[in-house]
């Protein structure tokens, strides 16, 4: 039996929203505030896509509970309220989401953000209505574990062969492969095309418009 692609699952940060600079500077500002070594831009970019606590451990080692709680509170304040770095949607994001839904695709989000963070950016960007469902790292196992994708496919009655995972990081590609879905990378986020292909991306696109054009063209 063959399956047509009908479900497209998007990562959020660096895929639909140009938020990488804000994440990097927020992590660095938080480290400085709590007295930890300030990580490089490259080091922070490499953990984007992971849920927050594993990302912190990868950057700073295992913190004790008091240190971790203090870091989490400061980081969330920094990212949401204190950091002036803009984090807009990519210019073609809304048009692409509209084109894909109009063409009959179901859309979903699988993100390392907490639910509170996703709801906030959905409200700010007025995009929640495009998505049939979503999973956040705060409510299931985080990337690159495939559990997010399993839960999304189960809820929407989609087979892996019908599903595309779109993301900007190697964590997205590894999750997609583990779940048996089609891994598609975008080259304008945290990891470049070469790293995405090395991680298993079957296709790497240079814009969301290119992604939409390819998917709609290949739809029966």
Indicate where each model-derived feature is located:
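Active-site neighborhood of HAD-like aspartate-dependent phosphohydrolases
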Residues: 1-46, 62
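Substrate-recognition "cap/lid" segment bordering the active-site pocket of phosphatases
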Residues: 85-88, 114-165, 170-179, 193-197
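Short, acidic loop-to-helix structural element flanking the phosphoryl-transfer center
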Residues: 4, 81-109, 115-122, 146
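A metal-dependent, Asp-based hydrolase signature
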Residues: 48-81, 94, 98-101
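Short acidic-hydrophobic, aromatic-tinged amphipathic segments that line or gate anion-handling sites
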Residues: 203-207
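Glycine-rich phosphate-binding loop signature in dinucleotide/nucleotide-binding domains
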Residues: 2-3, 102-105, 156-162, 218-219
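Hydrophobic alpha-helical segments typical of transmembrane helices
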Residues: 26, 40-43, 51, 55, ...
């Amino acid at each position: 039996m063959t399956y047509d692609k009908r479900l497209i699952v998007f990562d959020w940060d660096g895929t639909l929203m140009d938020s990488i600079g804000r994440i990097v500077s927020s992590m660095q500002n938080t480290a400085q505030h709590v007295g930890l070594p300030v990580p490089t831009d490259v080091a922070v970019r490499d953990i984007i896509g992971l849920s927050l606590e594993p990302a912190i451990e990868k950057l700073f080692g295992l913190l004790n509970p008091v240190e971790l709680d203090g870091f989490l509170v400061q980081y969330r304040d920094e990212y949401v309220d204190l950091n002036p770095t803009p984090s807009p949607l990519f210019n073609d994001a809304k048009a692409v989401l509209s084109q894909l839904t109009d063409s009959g695709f179901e859309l979903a989000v699988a993100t390392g953000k907490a639910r509170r963070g996703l709801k906030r950016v959905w409200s700010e960007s007025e995009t929640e209505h495009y998505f049939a469902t979503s999973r956040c790292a705060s409510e299931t196992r985080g990337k690159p574990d495939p559990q997010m994708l399993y839960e999304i496919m189960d809820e929407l009655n989609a087979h892996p062969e019908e599903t595309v995972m779109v993301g900007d990081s190697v964590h997205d590609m590894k999750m997609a492969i583990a779940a048996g879905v089609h891994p598609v990378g975008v080259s304008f986020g945290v990891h470049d095309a070469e790293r995405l292909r090395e991680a298993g991306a079957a296709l790497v696109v240079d814009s969301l418009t290119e992604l939409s054009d390819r998917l709609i063209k290949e739809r029966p």
